[in-house]
Regions:
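Conserved donor-binding/catalytic core segment of Leloir-type glycosyltransferases
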Residues: 200-226, 232-237, 247-248
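Acidic donor-binding loop of glycosyltransferase active sites
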Residues: 158, 300-313
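Acceptor-binding helix/loop patch of EC 2.4 sugar-transfer enzymes
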Residues: 51-61, 109-148, 189-200, 209-210, ...
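Nucleotide-activated donor-binding/catalytic signature segment of Leloir-type glycosyltransferases, i.e.
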Residues: 251-255, 259-293
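Short N-terminal targeting/anchoring amphipathic segment
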Residues: 2, 78-97, 103, 111-113, ...
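A conserved catalytic-core segment of Leloir-type glycosyltransferases
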Residues: 30-81, 85, 273
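N-terminal subdomain of nucleotide-sugar transferases
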Residues: 1-43, 161-163
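Carbohydrate-associated surface elements
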Residues: 166, 185
């Protein structure tokens, strides 16, 4: 069969699946916003955004318009592929960004499988979960509007997939009944204990190995949605109780979810400064982002891995 994967940051959730499908003998191609022509052995076709969002659009529709723009771009790429003789039998794609929105119109006879990562709720999930960071008064309405393109994408699919029961259960019943729970999977051939693992923190020249008191905190970015503020506030007591502990913090100083703080691009320094005077900074290591093999080694030597989150998409670093 000819199988097309669609994800703006391919491979994303399909890092293991796409190569496995190709290895099984199927023709595999990807469409993404990335510029590379080969991603993990899979041919990639780039879609280009040819217009920006409207400046005067209603604020509740900003995400929807962005999704329509992406959907239009992907529709054009898929149509060109078909005109040039490559029409997929199956399309596997993420429903959250609009790329699957017009796939049925472009490929009326293909089987469509949508990835259903998150359905936004005005209450009962991340909205107003943390009283320290209350959501905007119109958050429920924004959530409702934000689901429009996701709902439309899923309705055009033959089936949907969600990685956890909790994520699937966020969807209304008429949509939930279309979704199967199939986790992304864990690379158990790579993510295994290693008693000989060690890392050296380049700037600090500190070598850490299995058996050391290493506490890890890992996220794409250090922000309230993933509990960075709670972790930093716990550090003074953790370090006082464990005078030999080393704290390794992985993550950037931007915002992946929610709003940035006033007059800053990220939250790192805000919550570090809140407790800095009670910390032994020589035992705290902010390493920003690290290569995946280094991340695996770090998890192998970690004595305590701390993971916090609002009720939201489960991070890969948790698993």
């Amino acid at each position: 069969m000819k199988i097309l994967f669609v994800h703006q940051n391919f491979p994303g959730q399909y890092r293991a699946l796409a190569p496995a499908v190709k290895a099984a003998g199927h023709e595999v191609m990807a469409i993404s916003s990335r510029k590379e022509t080969d991603l993990g052995g899979v041919s990639n076709v780039t879609y280009e955004i040819k217009r920006s969002s409207s400046k005067s659009i209603h604020p509740w529709l900003v995400t929807t318009e962005s999704a329509v723009i992406r959907g239009e771009a992907v529709h054009g790429v898929v149509s060109n592929l078909s005109k040039n003789g490559w029409t997929p039998d199956v399309v596997v794609g993420h429903c959250g960004c609009g790329e699957m929105m017009f796939m049925r119109e472009a490929l009326p006879h293909a089987r469509l499988l949508g990835f259903c990562e998150y359905y936004y709720l005005g209450k009962g999930s991340d909205v107003n979960f943390d009283p320290e960071f209350p959501s905007a008064a119109d958050a429920p309405e924004r959530c409702h509007a934000r689901n429009m393109h996701l709902t439309e994408s899923l309705l055009s699919c033959d089936w949907g997939v969600a990685p956890t029961n909790w994520q699937a259960d966020l969807f209304p019943e008429n949509l939930r009944s279309r979704i199967k729970v199939i986790h992304d999977g864990i690379e158990t051939d790579r993510l295994i204990p290693d008693d000989n693992a060690w890392i050296e923190l380049g700037r600090d020249k500190v070598k850490l190995k299995k058996g050391d008191e290493v506490v890890t905190f890992i996220n794409r970015n250090l922000e309230p949605m993933r509990g960075y503020h709670q972790f930093m506030r716990a550090l003074p007591e953790i370090m006082a109780r464990r005078p030999n502990a080393r704290i390794v913090i992985v993550g950037g100083d931007k915002v992946s979810y929610g709003s940035p703080p006033p007059n800053a691009s990220g939250y790192k320094e805000i919550f570090l400064n809140e407790v800095r005077e009670r910390l032994d900074m020589s035992r705290i290591h902010f390493v920003s982002h690290v290569p995946y093999p280094t991340l695996v080694k770090l998890l192998c030597i970690s004595a305590a891995h701390v993971y916090f989150t609002y009720p939201f998409v489960l991070s890969w670093s948790m698993l």
